C-alpha cells in the first residue's frame, strides 16, 4: 500500500482528499496545514506520495526542491482549483509529478495518481533494463 501525506491549509480540503485516498486504497499517514509540519511528516513516514496545495508551495519557499533533494522517489502532486500553462510548466520544472484539481472528483484524483505511478514504474524498469543491457554489453567482449 502506498503511503501519502497531505499538506493543505484548508481542513475541509485535507479531509476530502484524505477520504478519496483512503477509499482508493492509499495509506494516508499524515496531514498538515503547514509546509514545516508537512516536512516533519515526511521525515517520520517517508511517504511515496505528497499532495501539497498550490498556496503551500508558494508560501513554503523551496519546499518542492527540499522534497526532491531529500526524498527523490516521492511523487509530488500539486493541488489547486486552477491551473494555467505557466503554472504547470513552472511546477514541472520544480519537480512536481502531477496535478490534482479542486473540487475533487474521486475517480479523477485516483486516475491521476495511478497514471503517474504507472509512468514512474515504467521509467524505472526502462532504466534498469538499459543498465542491465549496458552491463551485459560490457561483459561480452572480455575473456
Task: Enumerate the predicted regions with their spans.
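Alpha4 helix (beta4-alpha4-beta5 surface) of REC/receiver domains from two-component response regulators
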Residues: 62, 83-98
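Acidic, metal-coordinating helix/loop segments flanking the phosphotransfer/catalytic sites
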Residues: 33-49
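CheY-like receiver
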Residues: 118-143
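Two-component/phosphorelay signaling modules centered on CheY-like receiver
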Residues: 11-30
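Conserved phosphotransfer cores of two-component systems
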Residues: 43-45, 67-73, 94
Amino acid at each position: 500500500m502506498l503511503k501519502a501525506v497531505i499538506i493543505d491549509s484548508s481542513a475541509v480540503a485535507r479531509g476530502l482528499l484524505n477520504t478519496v485516498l483512503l477509499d482508493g486504497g492509499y495509506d494516508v499517514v499524515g496531514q498538515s496545514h503547514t509546509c514545516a509540519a508537512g516536512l516533519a511528516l515526511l521525515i517520520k513516514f517517508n511517504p511515496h506520495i505528497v499532495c501539497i496545495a498550490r498556496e503551500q508551495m508558494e508560501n513554503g519557499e523551496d519546499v518542492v526542491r527540499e522534497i526532491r533533494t531529500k526524498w527523490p522517489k516521492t511523487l509530488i502532486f500539486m493541488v489547486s482549483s486552477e491551473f494555467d500553462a505557466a503554472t504547470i510548466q513552472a511546477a514541472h520544472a520544480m519537480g512536481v509529478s502531477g496535478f490534482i484539481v479542486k473540487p475533487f472528483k474521486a475517480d479523477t484524483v485516483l486516475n491521476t495518481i495511478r497514471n503517474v505511478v504507472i509512468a514512474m514504474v515504467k521509467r524505472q524498469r526502462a532504466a534498469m533494463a538499459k543498465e542491465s543491457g549496458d552491463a551485459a554489453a560490457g561483459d561480452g567482449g572480455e575473456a
